[in-house]
């Protein structure tokens, strides 16, 4: 079975830190976690995959295409959630959604409403009024509303209590099963 994501020999150096020869593949309809202590390079790996930081060498093949050569096309097929994001804290969810949906050619309003209802989110609330768990659920609703085939999640369970963390992991399993989606996430919690 062809990998949804194949990372080959990614290298990125910073003063006092280096990612060296990071390689792995993610099969369709699977969940893969990057687990390590703080500062181990999990977020840097995800950012290098997404070209948010430029790796010095290596390649990323996503959906059988070179990600760096087909970045815009590939990004239409993925959902990205970075933990600890408090973007637009004073904006209502409905406002954030109205802006976000403009970036996706395959945005599905019915799908979005399904997840808003499923996650019991109130679109009239401001982002800062949500708990950490509800923030992640909202960001997942956004990510899944354009039929993402791959979710890349950085520390999605960070700051969650054990019950909320387990609920979120259950949601991940449901998404992979029902949405035919793969998930790559980072965490320092095992």
Residue ranges of each PLM-predicted region?
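Helix-to-loop junction immediately C-terminal to a conserved catalytic motif
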Residues: 50
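Conserved ABC transporter NBD signature motif
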Residues: 58-69, 73-74
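Catalytic Walker B motif of ABC-type/P-loop ATPase nucleotide-binding domains
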Residues: 151-155
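Short loop immediately C-terminal to the Walker-B catalytic DE motif
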Residues: 157-158, 190
